[in-house]
């Protein structure tokens, strides 16, 4: 569990997060949604530790991130998996080597065990073994995302952060990626946090949802309630997301 308590953050005198509080639960897909510029990305980066907050607490199972010593932060880094918007794979490495990379970086085990662990994770995301020796540029975008997921879980993380995981993917592939993230979250009991503006993803796998508007938590709840909320900003966001989806579908 990650508890965010009264977190505020400013850049050059501009307050982009204002006393945000929420709980990201273990074993559930927690989603941060909001329009561009709302502060949702700053919130995620603050929770990860990429931005130092001005006020508040970010507690990883009771451990307050801003108070941690560097040695404790290094330990925490091994507990965190990251799924970036653009997959962020190394094309100079094979698919298998990309998944092994975090294990090599932390020197946690033998070469044989690294390979075994990487194979386990790649099989877990249903990637064809024929792709293991290929460079990322030689496989499809959807397959690249599977590799990125495998790499994100290879350290057996307690916490998984996903930044717009469906960016650039077609609807069918997006659904597959959503289902993989949800499956991994529940099977391994991970605290998963997803930064997204994709309402399809929200309705498919969102369990705890926090809506950020102008740096504040404007609404929090579950997907069953999201279309029945008396909140103008949230309603406008949902409408805009649905409109964008229809326009995109019509142009395909």
Model-derived segments and spans:
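Conserved catalytic motifs of ABC-family nucleotide-binding domains
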Residues: 156
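Conserved ABC ATPase signature
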Residues: 135-139, 143
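Helix N-cap at the start of a conserved alpha-helix in ABC-type nucleotide-binding domains
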Residues: 171-173
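Conserved ABC ATPase "signature" region
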Residues: 112-130
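Conserved ABC transporter NBD signature motif
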Residues: 56-64
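Helix-to-loop junction immediately C-terminal to a conserved catalytic motif
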Residues: 48
């Amino acid at each position: 569990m990650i508890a965010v308590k009264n977190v505020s953050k400013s850049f050059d005198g501009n307050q982009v997060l204002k006393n945000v509080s929420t709980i990201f639960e273990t074993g559930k897909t927690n989603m941060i949604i909001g329009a561009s510029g709302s502060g949702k990305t700053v919130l995620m980066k603050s929770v990860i530790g990429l931005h130092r907050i001005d006020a508040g607490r970010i507690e990883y199972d009771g451990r307050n991130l801003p108070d941690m010593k560097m040695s404790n932060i290094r330990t925490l880094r091994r507990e965190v998996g990251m799924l970036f918007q653009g997959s962020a794979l190394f094309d100079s490495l094979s698919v298998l080597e990309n998944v092994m990379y975090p294990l090599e970086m932390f020197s946690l085990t033998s070469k044989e065990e690294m390979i075994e662990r990487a194979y386990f994770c790649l099989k877990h995301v249903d990637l064809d073994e024929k792709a293991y020796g290929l460079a990322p540029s030689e496989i499809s975008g959807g397959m690249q995302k599977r590799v990125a997921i495998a790499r994100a879980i290879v350290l057996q993380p307690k916490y998984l952060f996903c930044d717009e995981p469906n960016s650039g993917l077609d609807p069918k592939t997006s659904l597959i990626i959503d289902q993989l993230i949800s499956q991994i979250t529940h099977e391994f009991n991970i605290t998963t946090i997803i930064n997204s503006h994709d309402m399809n993803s929200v309705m498919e796998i969102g369990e705890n949802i926090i809506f950020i508007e102008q740096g504040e938590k404007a609404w929090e709840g579950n997907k069953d309630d999201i279309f029945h909320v008396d909140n103008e900003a949230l309603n406008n966001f949902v409408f805009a997301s649905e409109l964008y989806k229809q326009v995109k579908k019509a142009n395909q």
